[in-house]
């Protein structure tokens, strides 16, 4: 496919059908990787706590997310290097360490994603959770057994993303939230300082750790690199964040429509109780569809992105990306089936994940000013400043996640 996307002249850019398919694939891979089981729970819990004012946190987090995403995607495509390769050029060995940490974090998170998919199938069909997890793993593995695994991954990510958006949009419509009030508080929240933690949490969950590299590495794997592709990269990066933002906004409004009536969400499963209160007993089954789609897409995104970091560790791994993905999914599934969800491991992985983005984005911002890495490309100053803000916000994310680790001991 990479050959099909080469341009006749490097100075020109023509948006073709192949570019459109790849744009949608990279956008939905990044967006659906971010929309996992934790995304659903976070949005429901914060909405029930802050009501209409949570709209402000969503808006600000989207702006910061774009700052992080557009910096990373542009520099990666200009240089043709992955995140870990650029990090190694800035600080020798840094990229290797990051790759290992991302692999550890991705494996731990995939245990949670596999479990979430099992719970989703349980809610839809009444299947045993472990059987549901095993079926999810088999389905994910079948995608990557094919030589066209990455193309199939693009299509599956798009389908799962569209299903989630349509289902949540329906629940939002039924719950009938106060749209006008939410719009006003998007720009004029009550007690804005209380929204600092939600904003930091949302940014960490949307572009933290491996997630922001999912789409960019997918683009590189398709053979796209060079300054001539920057218009395409800008569209992809912003569209990815906006897609995640749309899903979060729809879910926020759906939850808002329920909690403003005085309903208290279930502490065990807040998002599921939203669906049940909005559309009745069938809400549990409908939520299962959303949970399965969110978890399944995150299984694919996490395993694929972790593989793109690991395959540069040694030449022998470079042509075995699909095999790495399959091994990744098998190991995480086996751990869940025979051990369960190791909570302490997930907390530690979350803390590590919280530090990956500020370190890697920091290295990429440094690289953007080095001619030895980016050549004659001039990175816009406003983007650089945007990136610095994203680094500072994600450092705060890392501090909060590290505190959770300290509570384990």
Per-region residue spans from a language model:
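Transmembrane alpha-helical segments of multi-pass small-molecule transport proteins
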Residues: 27, 96-100, 123-146, 162-169, ...
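Extracellular/periplasmic helix-exit of transmembrane alpha-helices
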Residues: 67-75, 221, 241-272
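Extracellular loop-to-transmembrane helix junctions
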Residues: 45-70, 87-88, 93-94, 197, ...
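Hydrophobic alpha-helical segments and their helix-loop junctions in multi-pass secondary transporters
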Residues: 161-190, 199-217, 363-373, 397-409
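Membrane-interface loop-to-helix entry segments
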Residues: 117, 131, 136, 146-175, ...
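Transmembrane-helix boundary/entry motifs in multi-pass membrane transporters
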Residues: 12-20, 51, 77-107, 123-127, ...
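Hydrophobic transmembrane alpha-helices that form the core helical bundles
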Residues: 95-126, 133-135, 292-312, 342-348, ...
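Membrane-interface "cap" regions at the ends of multi-pass membrane proteins
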Residues: 1-40, 195-199, 225-228, 239
């Amino acid at each position: 496919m990479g050959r099909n996307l080469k341009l006749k002249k490097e100075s020109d850019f023509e948006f073709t059908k192949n570019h459109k398919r790849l744009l949608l694939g990279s956008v939905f891979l990044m967006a659906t990787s971010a929309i996992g089981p934790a995304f659903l729970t976070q949005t429901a819990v914060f909405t029930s706590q802050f009501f209409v004012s949570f709209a402000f946190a969503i808006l600000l987090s989207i702006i910061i997310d774009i700052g992080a995403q557009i910096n990373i995607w542009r520099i990666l495509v200009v240089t043709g290097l992955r995140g870990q390769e650029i990090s190694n050029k800035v600080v020798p060995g840094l990229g290797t360490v990051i790759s290992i940490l991302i692999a550890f974090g991705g494996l731990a998170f995939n245990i949670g994603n596999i479990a979430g998919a099992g719970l989703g199938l349980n809610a839809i069909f009444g299947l045993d959770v472990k059987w549901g997890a095993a079926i999810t793993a088999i389905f994910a593995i079948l995608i990557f057994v094919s030589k066209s695994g990455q193309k199939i991954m693009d299509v599956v990510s798009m389908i799962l993303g569209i299903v989630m958006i349509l289902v949540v949009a329906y629940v939002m419509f039924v719950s009938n939230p106060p749209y006008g009030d939410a719009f006003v508080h998007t720009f004029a929240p009550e007690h804005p300082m209380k929204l600092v933690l939600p904003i930091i949490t949302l940014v960490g969950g949307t572009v933290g750790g491996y997630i922001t590299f999912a789409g960019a590495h997918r683009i590189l794997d398709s053979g796209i690199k060079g300054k001539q592709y920057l218009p395409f990269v800008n569209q992809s990066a912003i569209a990815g964040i906006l897609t995640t933002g749309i899903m979060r906004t729809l879910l926020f409004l759906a939850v808002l429509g329920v909690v403003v009536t005085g309903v208290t969400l279930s502490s065990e499963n807040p998002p599921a109780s939203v669906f049940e209160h909005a559309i009745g007993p069938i809400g549990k089954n409908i939520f299962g569809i959303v949970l399965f789609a969110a978890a399944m897409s995150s299984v694919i995104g996490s395993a694929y992105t972790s593989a793109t970091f690991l395959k540069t560790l040694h030449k022998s791994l470079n042509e075995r990306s699909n095999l790495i993905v399959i091994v990744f999914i098998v190991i995480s599934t086996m751990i869940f089936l025979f051990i369960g969800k190791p909570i302490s491991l997930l907390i530690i992985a979350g803390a590590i994940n919280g530090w990956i983005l500020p370190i890697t984005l920091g290295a990429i911002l440094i690289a953007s000013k080095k001619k030895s890495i980016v050549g004659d490309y001039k990175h816009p100053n406003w983007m650089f400043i945007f990136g610095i803000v994203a680094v500072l916000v994600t450092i705060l994310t890392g501090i909060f996640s590290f505190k959770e680790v300290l509570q384990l001991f």
